[in-house]
Amino acid sequence: MSLSPKQEQLFKQASKHIPGGVNSPVRAFNGVGGTPVFIEKAKGAYLWDVDGKRYVDYVGSWGPMILGHAHPDIIKAVQTAAEDGLSFGAPTVHETTLADIICEIMPSIELVRMTNSGTEATMTAIRLARGYTGRDKIVKFEGCYHGHSDSLLVKAGSGLLTKGEGEPTSKGVPADFAKHTLTLPYNDVAALKECFAKFGHEIAGVIIEPVAGNMNMVKPIDGFLQAIRDVCDEYKSVFIIDEVMTGFRVALGGAQSVYNVKPDLTTLGKIIGAGLPVGAFGGKREIMECIAPLGGVYQAGTLSGNPLAMRAGIEMFKHLRQPDFYSKLSAQLEKLLAGLQAAADEAGIPFKTQQAGAMFGLYFTDQEDITSFDSMLACDIEAFKKFFHGMLKRGVNLAPSAFEAGFISSAHSDEDIEFTIQAAKETFAEMK
């Protein structure tokens, strides 16, 4: 999609003082080509760019806008909070209220600590696992993203199961950090057991996205999450489920409630603040009591538990806890994905969709199942790029990467679904 001169000029201006013109790399459109669209405002299921063009949005600020953009109840809560003061650097009753809500909804969380982001939450959960166990090694999985802390920007090294060393995926990450992180194939129980057989007594914890959102959207195979629970129990390692993306998104109780698995620690992201900058980690009392000021594992943040995010989150949960909220959300997404699949089939284009609650993945492939990072890499990335730009041109905003999941909100109407399916029909016809 070619952008207006105004958009091109804005990107040029942004690139003058912002590295790459963006404040988060995926926004640069490197995964799909072209120049990013500059957004002016959002409301409900829609975004409007600086030229006034409207888009049906399936990114939702990367997941947290589950009620849609600028929901009036959330806006009112934030405005009321702002009138009382933006930040105090002191406790408020709203932190306690939100903590109570989270612990009630997720029984695996007995104590919870607020942070400023999902990255902070996962970074501290790793530190906490190490502090609790007195061990150094961490296990993670291909295709799972846990933020940009040094310990987690690591891929599998050639000597993983001989030397137990991973390799940094970013410059600036010391090899001494990476060597303590073991990266395994997602959904591979045999590799998990082999890793623990060799390094189990050195492993502080295992961290995983229960539904992997950094290889589009891949669900765990039957028994995979329980296998992690079992080896962590056997070797007394900490099981960390990263629900920054899935928490309160795939179900009210998160993915852990869907797959009936109980972690030792859980990390959460900005959805708990209705999209404002916030995160959290929580879990077993005996582990969480290792965090300062109760224990020797340090974590702090001036804006942790900031009143705007707390009060927005409290208001949001009133909607999420309605009895039929998630069933309606899931049904609406099923309707969308069925329509997209039918449109692709009619055009004769190999295409597959996957769904977990209100989270989805789109793949250009004739594979029956997408269960790993390797199967994701076997998909047609070039076809996705064409599809992305065709949909964007027709007023549908998808994640600008074949490796990112999509999201639907309660604001998406039947008309929005039909509009999207029609845009897909036209785009698929163009791709034939």
UniProtKB/Swiss-Prot annotation:
Q: Which GO terms describe its biological process?
A: protoporphyrinogen IX biosynthetic process
Q: In which pathway does it act?
A: Porphyrin-containing compound metabolism; protoporphyrin-IX biosynthesis; 5-aminolevulinate from L-glutamyl-tRNA(Glu): step 2/2
What cofactor is needed?
A: pyridoxal 5'-phosphate
Do the record's keywords include Cytoplasm? yes
| A GO term, aspect molecular function | pyridoxal phosphate binding
Q: Does the keyword Isomerase apply?
A: yes
EC assignment: the record states 5.4.3.8
Q: Please give the GO cellular component terms listed in this UniProt entry.
A: cytoplasm
Which residues are in coiled coils? none
Q: What class of enzyme is it?
A: isomerase
Quote the catalytic activity from the record: (S)-4-amino-5-oxopentanoate = 5-aminolevulinate
PTM annotation (N6-(pyridoxal phosphate)lysine): residues = 270
Keyword annotations for this protein, in alphabetical order, are: Cytoplasm, Isomerase, Porphyrin biosynthesis, Pyridoxal phosphate
**Membership in a protein family:** Belongs to the class-III pyridoxal-phosphate-dependent aminotransferase family. HemL subfamily.
Assembly, in brief, is: Homodimer.
According to UniProt, the name of this protein is Glutamate-1-semialdehyde 2,1-aminomutase
> Species name for this entry?
Acinetobacter baumannii (strain ACICU)
High-level lineage: Bacteria, Pseudomonadati, Pseudomonadota, Gammaproteobacteria, Moraxellales
